[in-house]
Amino acid sequence: NKGGKFIFGKSLIREDLTIHLPPQALTEYNATAEGKVYLFTGSKITGGFCVTRKSLLEPSKLGHILSANPALLNYQTSEGEFIKYKGRSYCWVSISRTGIIQLNQNIIDFLNLEIGMELLSIRSSDIAFTMGAKGPLLERAENYDGEIKIY
């Protein structure tokens, strides 16, 4: 379909506030390479959050996000502590070798997420992928006949 978004799968927000990111997204973005990832607020429409890592973000045209926020660049903020910058908010969290991220109540509340929610994992750019919480893409996924794997 024209302008279709590639879907990696869905990730469940588990009781222990962990999220297992879809394997294909992990591979494409080499997301576990640094042991830490940046989360930033998603679009108003899709909500949720986007996932990237330092070596993807720093050399990109969005690298100023890190150069303007050295505490974020050097992981000196607390894990899951959001810093607001130019209309979006950014934090870092650890990621396991198998692609599990541990959220905390602060992140859940800040992003309006809840336990049991299924986030739709979407390829958004060559810098980040999106874990969407709402909006037309999620509605289309709900009505999709094929299988979307849940992690």
Question: What are the residue ranges of the model-derived segments?
Answer:
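Intrinsic disorder/low-complexity detector
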Residues: 1-16, 39-98, 124-151
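DNA polymerase processivity clamps
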Residues: 35-41, 115-122
